[in-house]
């Protein structure tokens, strides 16, 4: 059995060792992704749409 870390290294075997992404690279990319999503939500501010769509139940019209 191989460890998950060893199995994950196989994804980037085709790259030279110097070009392979390190764990800090992946952490940085995830951090920037969170920052980008947070910034997009702050700019768009779709709170009314989200409340109407997911939180409030619409009354059925007869």
Swiss-Prot record:
It is found in: Mitochondrion inner membrane. Residues 2-25 are mitochondrial matrix. Component of the ubiquinol-cytochrome c oxidoreductase, a multisubunit transmembrane complex that is part of the mitochondrial electron transport chain which drives oxidative phosphorylation. It comes from Solanum tuberosum (Potato). Residues 45-62 are mitochondrial intermembrane. It is a single-pass membrane protein. This is Ubiquinol-cytochrome c reductase complex 6.7 kDa protein. Its main location: mitochondrion.
């Amino acid at each position: 059995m191989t460890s998950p870390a060893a199995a994950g290294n196989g994804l980037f075997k085709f790259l030279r060792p110097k070009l392979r992404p390190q764990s800090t690279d992946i952490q940085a990319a995830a951090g920037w992704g969170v920052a980008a999503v947070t910034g997009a939500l702050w700019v768009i501010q779709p709170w009314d749409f989200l409340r109407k769509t997911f939180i409030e139940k619409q009354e059925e019209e007869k």
